[in-house]
């Protein structure tokens, strides 16, 4: 029996180690009240996945119209089956903790149900083994003449049976306790994946269309824009804002050593538990720092309203959080950025004419002696005399003015070239800012890595925080990271 309990503990620990890869497709069995709600929303069967449970709950809220028409993240469930099950009158989708508490109480994993059935069968077999048969009763009746011998035999028979029962009960209690902890950890990890920044309302709303379960647990979600819009696939690669996989955490440079699952000792299990709790705390801290609710500077006046679905969004969001419509007049007030997005050719800046009204020729002029026109009759009669000294002085003055004009035109051309060069560099900087993060290649570059008097804007805020926590250097210049700040482009 000791070997049986040890093997059960090892198998339970192995299954706990595989939670990270199997928790997405975890099969759960809802209790009766929750099952009635799911069936009212169109669910069939008694075993579902976590995604299907969340989908049918959203369907139930949509069909019953329990949400507020103006602020659709508020759900009023008072006087309804859902309210009786939750034990509250209303809740917000942005803070779905009452919903998760209800699911923890009313969901049972299918693995634990199978284990309970196996334990019931084993206890029934032990009970049948302990019941005396008819032959034993007849044999005891024939030997009733010797009561001392019968009592001794009964004592010797009940002693190993009681010991076996005690061992069985202890092993069963250990197994049930371990399974309850395992089940709770599975559900906690499932809810930890969903509770990243609050359950988005558009996820529940858009699941009512084109919901087709597949073998790999993925579904297709169609946005509620026009018919010719793109299809978003519900996978861990596309929905990075809902699920952050372990591979993405390791890709940034944070390497965590995995715990040894084969070690059955209590010390190993406590270390594994500490590592899992530490990872949860880090993820909660990151989600709190990235969520819009923790930003105290953003007020309701700064939020922008979507023209498609009339939802108010954070000023730092480019797309609507519900329908993914592009924000109207996005970067319309920034002429340089609009120009860099529309065309790649940079138009020349008009030349600054300091000396307006002066005709500057393109080639060298031919200088000749000036023609003096007589103003009165006396000068008309008198022939003009040619003075070589005066003509030479005039030529020198003409040469000096020409050299000054050439120097000024050269300076103007040099200034124009330098301005064009700086403009080109600024355009390249704007184009680099528009590129995605150099590490995850998904999120925008909003994490400014500061080192000394310089900084680099090459990664997103999420990856920059992970680089700072892991003690890594700047990916651009390999300097030590001193501070990481989040940049909002307005």
Swiss-Prot record:
Intrachain disulfide bonds: none
Zn finger spans (RanBP2-type): 300-329
CDD domains given in the database record: MDM4, mRING-HC-C2H2C4_MDM4
Biological processes annotated in GO: atrial septum development; atrioventricular valve morphogenesis; cellular response to hypoxia; DNA damage response, signal transduction by p53 class mediator; endocardial cushion morphogenesis; heart valve development; negative regulation of DNA-templated transcription; negative regulation of intrinsic apoptotic signaling pathway by p53 class mediator
Ranges of compositional bias, category Basic and acidic residues: 268-291
Region of interest: Necessary for interaction with USP2: 393-490
Residues of the SWIB/MDM2 domain: 26-109
Localization per record: Nucleus
GO molecular function, one term: ubiquitin-protein transferase activity
Location of region: Disordered: 136-162, 263-294
Renumbered ranges of motif Nuclear localization signal: 442-445
Post-translational modification: Phosphorylated. Phosphorylation at Ser-368 promotes interaction with YWHAG and subsequent ubiquitination and degradation. Phosphorylation at Ser-342 also induces ubiquitination and degradation but to a lower extent. Ubiquitinated and degraded by MDM2. Deubiquitination by USP2 on the other hand stabilizes the MDM4 protein.
Keywords tagged on the record: Metal-binding, Nucleus, Phosphoprotein, Ubl conjugation, Zinc, Zinc-finger
GO cellular component: nucleus; transcription repressor complex
Zinc fingers classed as RING-type: ranges: 437-478
Family note: Belongs to the MDM2/MDM4 family.
Functional description taken from the UniProt entry: Inhibits p53/TP53- and TP73/p73-mediated cell cycle arrest and apoptosis by binding its transcriptional activation domain. Inhibits degradation of MDM2. Can reverse MDM2-targeted degradation of TP53 while maintaining suppression of TP53 transactivation and apoptotic functions.
Quaternary structure and interacting proteins, as annotated: Interacts with MDM2, TP53, TP73 and USP2. Found in a trimeric complex with USP2, MDM2 and MDM4. Interacts (phosphorylated) with YWHAG; negatively regulates MDM4 activity toward TP53.
Stated name of the protein: Protein Mdm4
Biological source species: Rattus norvegicus
Taxonomy of the source species: Eukaryota, Metazoa, Chordata, Craniata, Vertebrata
């Amino acid at each position: 029996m000791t070997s049986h309990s040890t093997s059960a503990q090892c198998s339970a620990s192995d299954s706990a180690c595989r939670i990270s890869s199997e928790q997405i497709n975890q099969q759960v069995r809802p209790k009766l009240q929750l099952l009635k709600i799911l069936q009212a929303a169109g669910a069939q069967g008694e075993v579902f996945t976590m995604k299907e449970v969340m989908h049918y709950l959203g369907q139930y809220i949509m069909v019953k119209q329990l949400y507020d028409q103006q602020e659709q993240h508020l759900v009023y469930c008072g006087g309804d089956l859902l309210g009786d099950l939750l034990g509250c009158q209303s809740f917000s989708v942005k803070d779905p903790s009452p919903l998760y508490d209800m699911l923890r109480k009313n969901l049972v994993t299918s693995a634990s149900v199978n284990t309970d059935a196996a334990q019931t069968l084993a206890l029934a077999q032990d009970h049948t083994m302990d019941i005396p048969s008819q032959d034993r009763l007849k044999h005891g009746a024939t030997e009733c003449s010797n009561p001392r011998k019968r009592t001794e035999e009964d004592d010797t028979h009940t002693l190993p049976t009681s010991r076996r029962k005690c061992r069985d009960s202890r092993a069963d209690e250990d197994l049930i306790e371990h399974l309850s902890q395992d089940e709770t950890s599975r559900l906690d990890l499932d809810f930890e994946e969903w509770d990243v920044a609050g359950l988005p309302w558009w996820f529940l709303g858009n699941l009512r269309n084109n919901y087709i379960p597949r073998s790999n647990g993925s579904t297709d979600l169609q946005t509620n824009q026009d018919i010719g819009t793109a299809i978003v696939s519900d996978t861990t690669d596309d929905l990075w804002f809902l699920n952050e996989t372990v591979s993405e955490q390791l890709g940034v440079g944070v390497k965590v050593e995995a715990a040894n699952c084969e070690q059955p000792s209590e010390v190993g299990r406590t270390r594994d538990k500490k590592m899992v709790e530490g990872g949860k705390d880090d993820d909660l801290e990151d989600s709190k720092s990235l969520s819009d609710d923790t930003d105290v500077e953003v007020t309701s006046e700064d939020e922008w309203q979507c023209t498609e679905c009339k939802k108010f969004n954070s000023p730092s969001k480019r797309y609507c959080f519900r329908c993914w419509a592009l924000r109207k007049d996005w970067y319309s007030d920034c002429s340089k950025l609009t120009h860099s997005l529309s065309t790649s050719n940079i138009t020349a800046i008009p030349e600054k004419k300091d000396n307006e009204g002066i005709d500057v020729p393109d080639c060298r002029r031919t200088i000749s002696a000036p023609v003096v026109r007589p103003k009165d009759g006396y000068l008309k009669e008198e022939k003009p005399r040619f003075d070589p000294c005066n003509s030479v002085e005039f030529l020198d003055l003409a040469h000096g003015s020409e050299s000054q004009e050439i120097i000024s035109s050269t300076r103007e051309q040099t200034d124009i070239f330098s301005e064009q060069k700086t403009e080109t560099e600024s355009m390249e900087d704007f184009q680099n800012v528009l590129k995605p993060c150099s590490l995850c290649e998904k999120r925008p570059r909003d994490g400014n890595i500061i080192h000394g008097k310089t900084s680099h804007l090459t990664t997103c805020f999420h990856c920059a925080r992970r680089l700072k926590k892991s003690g890594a250097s700047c990916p651009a210049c390999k300097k030590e990271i001193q501070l990481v700040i989040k940049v909002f482009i307005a």
